[in-house]
Amino acid sequence: MSKKPTTKKEVQTTGHSWDGIEELNTPLPRWWLWTFYATIVWGVAYSIAMPAWPIFASGATPGILGSSTRADVEKDIAKFAEMNKAVEDKLVATDLTAIAADPELVTYTRNAGAAVFRTWCAQCHGAGAGGNTGFPSLLDGDWLHGGSIETIYTNIKHGIRDPLDPDTLPVANMPAHLTDELLEPAQIDDVVQYVLKISGQPADEARATAGQQVFADNCVSCHGEDAKGMVEMGAPNLTDGIWLYGGDANTITTTIQLGRGGVMPSWSWAADGAKPRLSEAQIRAVASYVHSLGGGQ
């Protein structure tokens, strides 16, 4: 009886064999192979039609279709700027103290000011404006330099101790009493106890009494005789329990020893020919927004 012929195509092997097990050389399905070729063609076509290959001088090849997401974004920004132009012109022309009486400006500054704050201010002052160590809360009404809308506007526009803006608020730094040899270490320890006492914290009574005299001789010119601070000097109230850098003994000691001198950047200053970080309308919007948070005076 003859063997029945078969038309089944034998699958080739790679020639490798191990313990009777051979490695097959099965070709890829045709549909998969043609899909692979199609992706190559698509990739080449896309790189010709659209921006694709990096170029040091101009960023990337432009593509023959001239598509640019950056240009699209710029068009959208220009469109919305044109939409808001009328209300922004009105905002710039309105006295700062009159903004709160204009419903249209109130609505605009609450929304636009919040957007500016989230973009430029939240990194330091927090998303909810509650502040961080070294960056004041804008909610509590405790203002080192004043909380009127005019003052808030000026501080945003020109900054505080910003060395680049000649119109910045030139308030004095907290001196480094140990580094500059203004006080002896024992005197610093005494005045720390006095500050703890007047801020309602546990303190060494004997050292606090000695520290009161040190305070009177060295600190009242900025913090005032009642230790409640002076806006003109940018000196904080030491009796209310609100602390910019911390109110524990170690932090107060560090502050007195090494001093403090935080910088609020100027948001209107720009180098020659450069564009300011914030426009006049944006500064007014965020100033009005901050003033409305509950801490404004």
Curated annotation (Swiss-Prot):
Source species of the chain: Rhodobacter capsulatus (strain ATCC BAA-309 / NBRC 16581 / SB1003)
Protein transport found in the keyword field: no
Pathway: Energy metabolism; oxidative phosphorylation
Cofactor binding note of this UniProt entry: Binds 2 heme C groups per subunit.
GO molecular function (one): heme binding
Domain Cytochrome c: 108-199, 206-294
Cytoplasmic side: 1-35
GO biological process, one term: oxidative phosphorylation
Segments traversing the membrane: 36-56
Sequence ranges on the Periplasmic membrane side: 57-297
Record keywords, A-Z: Cell inner membrane, Cell membrane, Electron transport, Heme, Hydrogen ion transport, Ion transport, Iron, Membrane, Metal-binding, Oxidoreductase, Repeat, Respiratory chain, Transmembrane, Transmembrane helix, Transport
Membrane association type: Single-pass membrane protein
Residues annotated for heme c 1 binding in this entry: 121, 124-125, 264
Binding residues for heme c 2: 174, 219, 222-223
Name of the molecule in the record: Cbb3-type cytochrome c oxidase subunit CcoP
Classification via InterPro entries: CcoP_N, CcoP_N_sf, Cyt_c-like_dom, Cyt_c-like_dom_sf, Cyt_c_oxidase_cbb3_su3, Cytochrome_c_Oxidase_Subunit
Disruption of the gene: reported phenotype: No oxygen uptake activity by the cbb3-type cytochrome c oxidase complex can be detected.
Gene3D superfamilies: 6.10.280.130, Cytochrome c-like domain
